[in-house]
């Protein structure tokens, strides 16, 4: 009897706490406009969320992004599409410039959206194949569906082979096409 009563009390307490939390969340999510005395029933104004982060991180809202390298590898294999990994930093001027150029290029966006599993990372991954010549940013690495890093698809720099500049979008698009076309002949 004692255990049954304790269980009922616990359920009631959890339910009450859940209700209170829900009410508090609703109150915080809406700010009322009290400055206009002409309105009898104030309109709720949603609070603006500053710095809301999404998986695209500004690289293209229309593109479906995966969250982790492991998820990207699994989806690449499952969907028989290459994985394109963009390594960057949020506050790096070169990363920001490349991001703007990538978003502005319609063909790059179309290829990314339709033909690739896409991942952008702001932190290093454990797989050293993702940094064959260093951990610089921005760098773009392609991985085929057999989970092989495509070391043949490089940028134009000899000392940082997988680096791309904002002016290198045509080169990046060319490598995206190569990553896609080799896929059909290799598999």
From Swiss-Prot:
It is found in: Secreted. Keywords: Secreted, Signal. InterPro entries: AGR/TXD, Thioredoxin-like_sf. Residues 1-20 form the signal peptide. GO terms for cellular component: extracellular region. Its main location: secreted. Belongs to the AGR family. Probably involved in cement gland formation. PANTHER family: ANTERIOR GRADIENT PROTEIN 1, ANTERIOR GRADIENT PROTEIN-RELATED. This is Anterior gradient protein 1. It comes from Xenopus tropicalis (Western clawed frog). The lineage of its organism: Eukaryota, Metazoa, Chordata, Craniata, Vertebrata. The gene is ag1.
């Amino acid at each position: 009897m004692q255990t049954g009563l304790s269980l009922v009390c616990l359920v009631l307490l959890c339910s009450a706490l859940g209700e209170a939390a829900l009410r508090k969340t609703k109150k915080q999510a809406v700010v009322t406009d009290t400055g206009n005395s002409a309105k009898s029933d104030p309109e709720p104004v949603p609070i603006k969320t500053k710095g809301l982060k999404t998986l695209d991180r500004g690289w293209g809202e229309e593109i479906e992004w995966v969250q982790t390298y492991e998820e990207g590898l699994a989806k690449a294999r499952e969907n028989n599409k290459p994985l394109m990994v963009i390594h960057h930093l949020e506050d790096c001027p070169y990363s920001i410039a490349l991001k703007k150029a990538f978003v502005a290029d319609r063909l790059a966006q179309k290829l990314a959206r339709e033909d690739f599993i896409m991942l952008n990372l702001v932190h290093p991954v454990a797989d050293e194949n993702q940094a064959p010549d260093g951990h610089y940013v921005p760098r773009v690495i392609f991985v085929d569906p057999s989970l092989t890093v495509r070391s043949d698809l490089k940028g134009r720099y000899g000392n940082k082979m997988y680096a791309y500049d904002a002016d290198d979008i045509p080169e990046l698009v060319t490598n995206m096409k190569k990553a896609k076309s080799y896929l059909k002949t290799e598999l």
